[in-house]
Amino acid sequence: MSAEEQDTRSGGIQVIARAAELLRVLQAHPGGLSQAEIGERVGMARSTVSRILNALEDEGLVASRGARGPYRLGPEITRMATTV
């Protein structure tokens, strides 16, 4: 594996870990949180939080009531959990 491929792979792993961290924060706050609140709790830049939330929302893993939240766990999480 080339150095470039390793960098891409480790970056992919990092974003998965960050996404999982966001999901855990939302699990602890069922009423939902804004992007800013999520960023404060996980120590990530708002732009990073926004990018990850958008991807998670596209997959149904998080849901929001507006452009900036509040965000909460989405319906796909429930569907996935029922198969465990």
Task: Please report, for each region that a protein language model flagged, where it lies by residue.
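N-terminal helix-turn-helix
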Residues: S2-V84
